[in-house]
Amino acid sequence: MNEQLDVLKLVAERLQHAAIAYMISGAIALHYYAQPRQTRAIDIVVALRREDAERVVNLFAEDFYIDADAVRNAIAQLGMFNIIHYDHVLKVDFIVRKETPYRQEEFARRMAVEIHGVTMWLVTAEDLLLSKLVWAAERHSEMQLQDVRNLMRAVADLDWA
């Protein structure tokens, strides 16, 4: 987890320094709220526009494998691209935020939290739960359903409204 934490901190600090809005999601967010699940990937939702592509590539090119075409395509299609840290061989998946009303609200609700001395933006527990239910339905994933159960057990004050 130390290498993963080092890469997470590096990515979060670079995004913040570049004023690129983001939120951590997926298994890393689950780890913040509930029982951790083994994963080597870091999932980060980012708010990007076409003109941000070159800046994103330049932010990470020194320490990460990054494909400029994949970044441009992901932004254009509101899809996903990844970067891989050269030394730690850890993958960071960047999910370009969708422009649906729910995804915009989800992003607006993100929370600033401190993780090992660094302030980072994190999806709320409620939005993580909803996303995992969607992923479970789309992929017929028992792992996602187990994550939902773990989250519901661990977070006593979920807002059901």
Task: Please tell me what each predicted stretch does.
Residues M1-A161:
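Compositionally biased terminal segments of proteins
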